[in-house]
Amino acid sequence: MTSIIARMSNSRRQNTSLPPWAHSMLRSLERSLGPLMAILAERNLKLFSGRVVPAQGEETFENWLIQVNEVLPDWNMSEEEKLRRLIKTLRGPAREVMLLLQAANPNLSVADFLHAMKLVFGESESSVTAHSKFFNTLQAQGEKASLYVIRLEVQLQNAIQAGIIAQKDANQSRLHQFLLGAELNGDLRFRLKNLLRMYANEQERLPSFLELIRMIREEEDWDDIFIKQKRAKRSESVVARATRPVAFGGSPPIVIDNKDCNVIEIDDTPDDSDEDVILVGESQDLPRSFSDSPPSRRRARPQDQVLIIDSPNNSQFPSPCTSGGSGYKNDGPGNMRRTRKRKHTIRCSYCGEEGHSKETCDNESNKAQMFENLIITLQELAHTEERSREAPVEPSDPCELQ
């Protein structure tokens, strides 16, 4: 029956003229006998294990591939069903490698499956090529270690068939090259190195291909769990920071208090001018602490005493409530304050001009101008002393700038 259907199919392909009833009968026979023919073809396929010496009932790779190419055109079924039937014809290492390849690539097609079989179990390459490919197979960027070890196994089998690596040294060669070419975490790398060192003379106790795959997959599962937990904690911290009330920066004003005066110093901002404005008043007018209640902003009133300090860095003119220099200076109990440096104009005491000091003055030849300036200064001092004698003496506020 099979031969009759085959002859009729060949005649149809050759465009041989057939009566209509023959075409109708042929279509009916194909629909009814097609599944039966596929089952018969599958049963006729020989087994393949990938071993160097095939066992009884097994075929070499070349004979197995020829049979597969013959029956594939008669399999009218999905790609998944074809793969399932092909894998059923495999045994031993060939079945293990192809199952792992299918697990790593769920959308594996029949063409890709046969291509992988040719790479692993096909004709041996030259010894130089096989040696170079195996020892230069490295993990690609972004590739999982479990997929890398499958690619490495393909090159290892090629090297074994080329006679470069002995079958008994397969586990040691696989593990050694895997440690060289894979990106692993510290724990797994330490375990594999320890195994390689412990069983250097007992290679049969080293992990096989399947055992190595299992160890790698377990480590990858742990890494995935750790990454998920880390991402969850990070998202929680981001949410916590987002819901936390925002504390605006800026240091509070500094209160300087003694028995005579109170001073509030406010830190500079980028928009401040070059002058410091300090409000000076009686003790009862200023708050003792800023921790009890927030201070209210107030402007300088006409009755307030306002001190404008142009250059507070001149430490040679100290005052009871202010001090020069930079940083913090203690002028007495309760009188700690922070001062700031200001730019000031340099005036020469030799010639009276601005822009340079006495040490760099080059106007020594102008003696007449120097003596004239000195006489004017002495006259001003004499007039000031006479006015101070005529005016009544009044007690001065220690906070006022003389």
UniProtKB/Swiss-Prot annotation:
Biased composition (Acidic residues): 268-277
Residue ranges covered by zinc fingers (CCHC-type): 346-363
Region (Disordered): 268-342, 383-402
Biased composition (Polar residues): 311-323
Pfam families the record matches: PNMA
Record's keyword terms, sorted: Metal-binding, Transcription, Transcription regulation, Zinc, Zinc-finger
Biased composition regions of type Basic and acidic residues, renumbered to the chain: 383-392
Gene Ontology molecular-function annotations: nucleic acid binding; zinc ion binding
GO CC aspect terms: nucleus
Subunit-structure text: Interacts with SMAD1 and CREB-binding protein (CBP). Forms a protein-DNA complex through its association with SMAD1.
The family this protein is said to belong to: Belongs to the ZCCHC12 family.
Protein name: Zinc finger CCHC domain-containing protein 12
Organism: Bos taurus
